[in-house]
């Protein structure tokens, strides 16, 4: 699964996930893309599960790009531990997603195959998505 090799700080504040995605909001590498239409967080497990479903469906054809990376640590305290005594340990990693963010891109397959592969992948993700096509080469 995806996670940073090293970070400047082990734990981060919760923060807010507002606004629209101003970067990575167009199909840049492939021919077709899966674009987020809502705010949310994608865990490393969700990103990997969706990647597997895409690559299993397209088999050996096509090339895929993952446009998101889980770089935010989410902490959790152990079960039955009283409140206080500091922040919990890092449990998993997430990528924060804004509307308009491109999540996956693919090329080298027909539109029908790409559409079905992204439909299967979208079922594994916790944000609503839409299928987009590259407009300008």
From Swiss-Prot:
Family the UniProt entry places it in: Belongs to the universal ribosomal protein uL16 family.
Gene Ontology process terms (BP): translation
GO molecular function per UniProt: rRNA binding; structural constituent of ribosome; tRNA binding
Self-association state and partner proteins as the record states: Part of the 50S ribosomal subunit.
Function (record text): Binds 23S rRNA and is also seen to make contacts with the A and possibly P site tRNAs.
Pfam family, one: Ribosomal_L16
GO cellular component: cytosolic large ribosomal subunit
InterPro entries on file: Ribosomal_uL16 (IPR047873), Ribosomal_uL16_bact-type (IPR000114), Ribosomal_uL16_CS (IPR020798), Ribosomal_uL16_dom (IPR016180), Ribosomal_uL16_sf (IPR036920)
Annotated PANTHER family: 50S/60S RIBOSOMAL PROTEIN L16 (PTHR12220), LARGE RIBOSOMAL SUBUNIT PROTEIN UL16M (PTHR12220:SF13)
Descriptive protein name: Large ribosomal subunit protein uL16
Protein keywords: Ribonucleoprotein, Ribosomal protein, RNA-binding, rRNA-binding, tRNA-binding
């Amino acid at each position: 699964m995806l996670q940073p090799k090293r970070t400047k700080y082990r734990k981060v504040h919760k923060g807010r996930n507002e606004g629209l995605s101003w970067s990575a909001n167009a199909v840049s590498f492939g021919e077709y893309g899966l674009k987020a239409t809502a705010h949310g967080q994608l865990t490393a497990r969700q990103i990997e599960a969706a990647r597997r479903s895409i690559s299993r469906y397209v088999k050996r054809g096509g090339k895929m790009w993952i446009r998101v990376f889980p770089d935010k640590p989410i902490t959790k305290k152990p079960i039955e531990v009283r409140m206080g005594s500091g922040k919990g340990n890092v449990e998993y990693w997430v990528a924060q997603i804004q509307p308009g963010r491109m999540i996956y891109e693919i090329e080298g397959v027909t539109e029908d195959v790409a559409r079905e592969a992204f439909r299967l992948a979208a079922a594994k993700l916790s944000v609503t998505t839409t299928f987009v096509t590259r407009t300008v080469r």
